[in-house]
């Protein structure tokens, strides 16, 4: 076979003839055969190739033509097995199939209509019917597990995007610092410090925290759904306050939205007026919040110890509480549970807010129907015996401070119970008429009243009586005659404990700051001045200012293990978390960037 006329690339050397050799190459069609449709001449393409071969000398007559040689012989032989019957019936040749000819490519061929797909036979079904969906065969938790996986994936990408934005913001801040200095050593220090922190944070994200990493020193508080413990991290000895919440109680008492709201506000807040949250984690039974430990105790402990405050001391603490509430409002949240128990004092004696709506109050008892019946005098719930004095029946004066403190201690025990204390809650929350940010300013007024008078304005022996007094505040608000208050102090209290339309602070915290009672107060520098009370601490784990003697020191985890052992259930570490208890808490885990760098 002569290979001198094989096609080759046009590289400017087409006039150079390749040296012939004795190697044999396979022959293939130069162009893929085109289908021939009715009315089309099959020889048109071949005539074009012949004409092109004459002018360009790229083809020869009958060279690489499959109509000659073996291709022509095989076209007239049956070299396969017997054909099988098609379920679709008989059909014509495919349009892509080259027509079999006897070398006469100019012969006209006739074909059927190949533009419409062949239809299956009416007597035979093409596909078997699809089986009916039966998710129950996979177990009752199949749908919950599907939702859990979907939520996990969604939260994973949301957290990744959020961390990327925060990292870009930190990079912008670092570049700004680099641009403010020309000192090479200073720039190198800023760069290396930022890189080290980012690396530590990435490693911190990959670690899994658990309660076994911390040693419990003492239980410093208990609420309706959990407890707060003073703990020390075993790895580095740092001291924290660990709040643990029981998942089953959160689920039963409809507190799922509240627990997530508390986590979100503490995670988003970086204010000095709000307790700092470092990390959150969970296991099969508990939710854990690792927060900063504030050794000064709470404002209720100070009221029990000092009974009443002077107007100057009251002015200081109320001014700081105003800034703390305003910081929460700027984050878009309403605290709704401002009370002395939730106002903590740090090492310097300054105020910080904590416990965002979880420990007390907002569950079945806050149903609108309950208060409708209560206002109609249909309440038949028996009174609970909390060893309280009959404050509603006695005349509160300065001379019976012992009875007032007995009431305060009983009220603290009530705060530990599932009933909670309604003394500081605004009436619009009870009546269901809708409430806004100004409901926290009502609570501020009741706290100010207690600091100056010695008891809340609507306190009573029974919580139902307290509800009645709050709702009918116009008739029950009373200032004792034997206690002299300044004109500005009483005016501020009355401007806060009033209907929501006229309440001071409805337009913002600046309305309260500009009141005459705070004349001369520099709100911007409050945390830089010395507080009226500074805790005297002997160590980093000193709990002198917490009522630990009144709190049962048996933690909830120990009680849960004992209950499960009595039932013969698996240990908490070996339990598999059910979708009902895991699905609502997906995305609860949080790790602050500066957790390991304080």
UniProtKB/Swiss-Prot annotation:
Keywords from the named record: ATP-binding, Kinase, Nucleotide-binding, Phosphoprotein, Serine/threonine-protein kinase, Transferase
EC numbers: 2.7.11.1
GO MF annotation list: ATP binding; identical protein binding; protein serine kinase activity; protein serine/threonine kinase activity
Chain residues that bind ATP: 220-228, 243
Residues forming coiled coils: none
Domain of life of the native organism: Eukaryota
Reactions catalysed: L-seryl-[protein] + ATP = O-phospho-L-seryl-[protein] + ADP + H(+); L-threonyl-[protein] + ATP = O-phospho-L-threonyl-[protein] + ADP + H(+)
Top-level enzyme category: transferase
Role: Protein kinase required for hyphal elongation.
Name of the protein in question: Serine/threonine-protein kinase cot-1
Organism: Neurospora crassa (strain ATCC 24698 / 74-OR23-1A / CBS 708.71 / DSM 1257 / FGSC 987)
Chain's gene name: cot-1
